[in-house]
């Protein structure tokens, strides 16, 4: 037993020389390591060299394309405002030119109108057709009303579920409209001074928007639409002109209202 302990001690002291070049103390013949474990250590040492351990893989940054300027900026002003339709656009930019061409045609001639089940014919002749629609969310109607608000520089109107629009169509283009709604009260306005009276009057129909395309103005379209709305808006009831009021009328709208009604009365939307 003493001899065995001394041998273990001797082998432990010579553990540092296990991987020396001496044949008698090689890993394959060392009594401290099993043969299989020694072979695995040798293969692992051969598989990964110190140079490979120190080597670092450096990734090249991805190349990004520089932004390309589509138009030259030489300090000159390239935008212009059309005196006819009022649109501002870039004269040297193709998409702007196309957009102006489309908008210009729409502003002068009116947008294309496609008859649908949401609109009914209330008047028709050889030259025009008047449609009435209460479905203001219909794409054809809503797009036209957006154009009207843009042309009049007016916000989105506050309307009830009883609102209706009368559209004047010529050659399948909507060239004019009157947007009306049910109201209950109004006030008199002095055209000369712009003073709003304090006294309230009963009213039935409120005119929220009046619009005619540029090429069709001064042809009596708005007057025609107001007359139709006055007799058609409330089923079975012919309204008097003093039962009709207007909201947010422009300078031209005030003149039209005065010529049509004589005395102009106004109301506030949502009241």
Curated annotation (Swiss-Prot):
Annotated keywords: Acyltransferase, Cell cycle, Metal-binding, Nucleus, Transferase, Zinc, Zinc-finger
Database matches in Pfam families: Acetyltransf_13, zf-C2H2_3
Protein name: N-acetyltransferase ECO1
Gene name per UniProt: ECO1
Chief place of localization: nucleus
Function according to Swiss-Prot or TrEMBL: Probable acetyltransferase required for the establishment of sister chromatid cohesion and couple the processes of cohesion and DNA replication to ensure that only sister chromatids become paired together. In contrast to the structural cohesins, the deposition and establishment factors are required only during S phase. Acts by acetylating the cohesin complex component SMC3.
Residue segments, region Disordered: 1-38
Family, similarity comment: Belongs to the acetyltransferase family. ECO subfamily.
EC id: 2.3.1.-
CC per GO annotation: chromatin; nucleus
